[in-house]
């Protein structure tokens, strides 16, 4: 396996997240390389490092976002699933998970915080894009795809993961969700400048 670890940072990353990424790739049998984005918007922060990984010759891509928390063995579980595209669920806020399913249990979309994709499957789903959104009605049963109006551009966040997942869903190639969940990190208090005794960030982890 030739694994491209894609970290679509827009400028910052949690240090423990980096430690966990290194721990995970060292725990599996693969040749790996890290591809990062720096100070780039969504979706360019995804598409550009993925393109670099394609050029490098990656056979698999592990998308890992900069604020994630990874339990030991999560990458091995993604690989062992054998799915063309597999993802771990994680909370977007306390008590609210990322994965969305239809009434039959099929995955409409997951987040891109911990997602493993085979090269061919990823190429068929690219590029990530944010120029469409979905209007959800009928108590979550009906999803209508619409182009984001000019008046709303610049006022939205994300949606690349929803567009990505829904494209796979409509092709009857839904994302596989592994049993293990990941977590997210957030800053509770920023370090106080020029104070040794308060020179660190207080960071909390949110899990399922």
What function would you assign to each model-found segment?
Residues 40-45, 157-158:
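A short, glycine-/small-residue-rich helix N-cap motif at loop->alpha-helix starts
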Residues 58-69:
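Short beta-strand-to-loop acidic/aromatic patch adjacent to the donor-nucleotide binding site
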